[in-house]
Regions:
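Conserved N-box asparagine in the HATPase_c
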Residues: 123
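Low-complexity, intrinsically disordered Gly/Pro/Thr-rich segments
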Residues: 104, 115-117
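C-terminal long alpha-helix characteristic of the crotonase
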Residues: 50-98, 102, 106, 127-131
């Protein structure tokens, strides 16, 4: 997993900051968002970004086993649990999404974003001059 928005001169998008803060805490989320470093599967499980890690070559087997386990449980209970988790864990996401959209719009008008796009097109690393 890579939080690569910073590599394009942008803040996070699609509520990624909001979700990361809740999964790994604000300090780790800030580091991930600011560095754009890649995290492998094992790191994702250790930090709480993923819940299941499939062994090499066993993705389908692991997925089907989890699906079968979930299918054997009460779908009514699952629906209630999902509703409650989303309501109370992500309750203020709508306001966050609006704020995030305003920040991304502001970022996209900055020289850093233009430099990132040009660097991508020219297949080179961006050089940011903005302080």
């Amino acid at each position: 997993m890579i939080m690569a928005f910073v590599n394009m001169g942008l803040c996070g998008d699609n509520e990624s900051i909001y979700t990361l803060m809740r999964l790994v805490g604000p300090d780790k989320a800030e580091l991930m968002m600011m560095t754009g470093d890649a995290y492998k599967g094992e790191q994702c499980v250790k930090t709480g970004l993923a819940t299941v890690l499939a062994e090499d070559g066993k993705l389908a087997e692991t997925t089907y086993a989890l699906a079968a386990k979930l299918a054997a449980k009460s779908s009514t209970a699952h629906a209630s649990q999902k509703r409650l988790i989303r309501k109370y864990f992500y309750g203020d996401m709508e306001k966050f999404a609006k704020d995030e959209g305003m920040e991304i719009a502001a970022n996209s008008r900055q020289p850093d974003f233009t430099e990132a796009v040009n660097a991508f097109i020219e297949k080179r690393m961006p050089v940011y001059n903005q302080k």
